[in-house]
Amino acid sequence: MNEFDQVNNLSPLPRKEIINMQSYSAPLENRRNLLRLDFNENTLGPSQKVYEAIKDINLNQISIYPEYNLLKKFVSNHYYESRQFDSEEIGLFNGADAAINAIFNSFGDRDEIFLTTNPTFGYYSPCSEIQGMRKITCTYEGDNFCFPIKQFQEKIIKFKPKLIFICNPNNPTGTVLRAHQIIKLAELNKKSLIVIDELYEKFNGDSLLPIIDFEKIKNIVVIQSLSKTAGLAGLRIGFAFGHKSIIQHINKVTGPYDVNSFAVTAALAALKDKSYIENYVSEVNKARVLIEKKLEPLAIRKHFGGGNYFLIWPNKDPRILTRQMRENGILVREMKNKKDIENSIRVSIGTQEQMSFFWTTYKKLDLNN
């Protein structure tokens, strides 16, 4: 029995959008005890202060529903030293993915236009398909994957999209769109909600948040998380920043207690330990310089952007190399079925020691043949 027959034999039937869509599933199993350079996570884990805060959670905290005011207050006052936020301009979510899904649930309409780039983070597409939206994409330009700003402007004016998603820096190309360019895009059509996914922003330091005034620019939402820098990917904590009325509508489609008490406690401890995050980001950026210098003289294509990852087009079949790297203790991500970057692998950047291990292994497997 094929998938179509299986669905037709179901009672009740799921929505037709669900039947027709492909699920987003990342191959994240059996990754323990390996050097994880495949999903752009923090490769060291959270700070000692996070461990201590979680260890000190008492049973009473587990048995009652989580409270968010303390974390929201801290984020309001200390997330960026250069500015403060109104607590109503902040949404807390069970990871950035939950924030993305909630935005589509609250603003995505059937047959409305969803505009994004290609290639980009794969979770945007299924979220738009669930809502029955029409997806339009702009392709990155040239070998350096420059942002297609002119294409984007033309499509905003022509199609007046309901939702626009820009991953900035983009995953997987690392392309960066500057803050002033984003604000200009928002001004082209104020009925378009522009969502800026800034999960990797700390690695290049060009966030909208220090400069944007949500009272003046109401059609921008900024998403961040603590997965890539603070090492909290397993606890799932994400933030959405925007005009208070926009955040209020997004919150309507989430559960009242979606973020658990462990995540709240860990997030507060991580945000208070800013030096740990700063030191980790600094170490990753030093490791980027190290691996860039190693790869520079090689006659193979490679691309570094603004995130904690890079692309490389190996001599070997990327599927074979990915498997062999795993057999040697290192996970990397094959970029199959992704426009303009097929036959490449994406490599997360860890510490200098970790990238030296990557280099030794990669050289042995792909260059010494």
Q: Which role fits each region the language model picked out?
A:
Residues 71-72, 234, 306-307, 339-343:
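Short acidic/glycine-enriched loop/turn segments that link adjacent beta-strands
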